[in-house]
Amino acid sequence: MIAHCTNVVTEGTARKFARGLLFLLLMVSPLAWGDVALYQAVVPLKSTAEADRAAAFGEALRIAAVRASGRRDAGDAAAIAAAAADPTGYVQQYSTTAERMLKVGFDARAMEQLLQQAGLPLWPSERPTTTVLLFVPAIAGGTRAVTAAERPPERLEIERAAQVRGVPVTWPAETVDAGTARARATSAGVTGAVLLGTAGAGGYDWTFGHAGQSARGQGGPAAGLGLAADTLAARYAPGSTRGLSTVPVRIGGLEGVRSYAALTTYLDGLSLVRSVSLRELAGSTALFDLGVRGDLELLRRIFALDGRLTPAPRTEAATNGQEAPDFVWQP
């Protein structure tokens, strides 16, 4: 029998403390990413019967595997399907709502091991926030953009899909014209993402933009969100996340003890970082060995989301026998 708990413990005390400090440190600047709870899911519950609850636990586990890996077919992997058939060893907490929905939290360590057994990658919880620019049919003809103050059925469908895939989304506070929306979608940088959907005779035409790249597709609202999730997962959940590696990273811009403490707290709070070891400290530059689920390129991409660690200028040469840093800390 699974205990009905009230709290989810997904990380060690030190890491939870670090992530809390990271949140406080970054509150002073707007975040371009959302911190997604990877191993949680909300699913319908047919009844309070044990068989229905077990089936709901299994469905929630499949959804958690999709959220954590970024792969829409993760639930079909043999190891995931076997775990979903007997999920009790993975469930850490659950609760039910008045709407007969089951909220389930899974053990993070057990789920991460399960993803590895299934040969699935890991999509870190720091994910770009996607601004949705959705143009729905207007009563007077043509289309109009959905704003944050509105909740048409299409928005609800997108948000349900975003919950399943683990994609943080936001909506424009004010109306946007079609030309501006197209420009934003095709010119989105590394700090944010834009999903543009325009209603047409055969459904919706979708354009997703992030990091200077764009992808296109067609289909309903859920298909548009799926395009965004698949594109982001391809960038942030590479094959290197299937295992652990040690990545040496040289970081400059450390102007004192407080700066160094803030940096180490930041690094330890990142979800793909498993360990932070200082190898060398010289002047304002530190060389760390980071144990990560991924590689240096993924670290670069995650760092770029909030700009706290920026690539060191290529023109910055080594001085006094000290190697040039890879990144510069922005306190």
Residue locations for each model-derived region?
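Bacterial N-terminal signal peptides that target proteins for export
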Residues: I2-L21
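N-terminal signal peptide c-region/cleavage motif recognized by signal peptidases
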Residues: V28-S29
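Boundary at the C-terminal end of the N-terminal hydrophobic targeting segment
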Residues: A32-V36
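Amphipathic beta-strand/beta-sheet edge segments enriched in Tyr/Trp
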Residues: Q40-V42, K46, A183-L227, L287, ...
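N-terminal segment of the mature soluble domain
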Residues: F57-D76, R127-T180, L263, D268-L287, ...
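Signal peptide-directed extracytoplasmic domains
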Residues: G75-V136, T147-P153
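A short, hydrophobic beta-strand-centered structural micro-motif
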Residues: D86-Y94, T131-F135, V164, P168-D205, ...
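C-terminal soluble interaction/assembly domains
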Residues: Y236-P331
